[in-house]
């Protein structure tokens, strides 16, 4: 959902290594697995301030810079196909299922979703060059906007909430066809509701 929201906005989207696979934080269970000096120092500080080892590790799992330094997960083999040697830092345990090889074989994967987002930016001039018009909504968890270039228009609606939300009436003005969504759907136009963290990208139909 976040990728859909960012890639349909103005500007140049940035993809950090592994984001396009849904790579996760490291999930280390022992401080010896960390390499970042600030993380290991902060771990000791937290212990001195009364945190348990489990509490300190939980905090590092959310905040440590090492979460963004784990090797690229190419496949489910040894060291995720990154190296035949010993990597500088260990991999998350989920690399056997979250990796390039597995996601290239699955058209419903996060990797395929990112590829389609990039393709839409190339195929639709309104996304790459158009203006942006935000749509007012009564729900702060709904982000909706139009990208407009001449007669071309792209509508993007995103639910940042953990519950199903109604699509604002202002998004239903005009006829649209669905370009991309992060849920499987038979709907062809603007839906009445968005599921939790659902994102839909639609193109205005020409008359």
Indicate residue ranges for each PLM-predicted region.
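Beta-strand-rich binding/interaction modules
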Residues: 164-182
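Short, surface-exposed beta-strand/loop "edge" segments at domain boundaries and coil↔beta transitions
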Residues: 152-153, 184-187
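A short, polar/charged loop/turn motif at coil->beta-strand junctions and beta-hairpin connectors
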Residues: 66, 139, 172-173, 196
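Active-site donor-binding loop signature of nucleotide-sugar glycosyltransferases
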Residues: 74-77, 181, 204
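C-terminal beta-strand-rich structural cap/linker in extracellular carbohydrate-active enzymes
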Residues: 188-207
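Ordered hydrophobic segments in well-structured contexts
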Residues: 142-144, 154-158, 177, 198-203
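Loop/helix patches that line or flank the sugar-binding groove of alpha-linked glycan CAZymes
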Residues: 1-154, 160-165
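General secondary-structure edge motif
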Residues: 52, 97-98, 177-180, 184
């Amino acid at each position: 959902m976040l990728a859909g929201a960012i890639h349909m906005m103005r500007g140049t989207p940035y993809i950090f290594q592994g984001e396009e696979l849904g790579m996760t934080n490291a999930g280390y269970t022992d401080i010896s697995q960390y390499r970042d000096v600030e993380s290991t120092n902060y771990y000791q500080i937290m212990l001195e301030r009364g945190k348990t080892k489990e509490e300190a590790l939980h905090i590092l799992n959310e905040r440590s810079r090492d979460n963004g330094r784990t090797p690229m997960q190419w496949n489910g083999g040894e060291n995720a196909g990154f190296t035949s040697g010993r990597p500088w830092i260990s991999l998350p345990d989920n690399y056997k299922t979250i990796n390039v090889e597995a996601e290239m074989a699955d058209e419903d994967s996060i990797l395929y979703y990112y590829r389609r987002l990039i393709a839409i930016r190339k195929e639709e001039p309104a996304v790459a060059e158009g203006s942006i018009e935000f749509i007012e909504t009564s729900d702060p968890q709904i982000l909706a906007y139009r990208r407009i270039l001449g007669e071309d228009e792209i509508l993007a609606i995103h639910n940042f909430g953990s519950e199903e939300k109604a699509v604002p009436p202002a998004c239903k003005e005009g006829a649209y066809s669905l370009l991309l969504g992060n849920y499987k759907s038979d709907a062809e136009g603007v839906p009445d509701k968005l599921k939790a963290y659902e994102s839909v990208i639609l193109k205005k139909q020409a008359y």
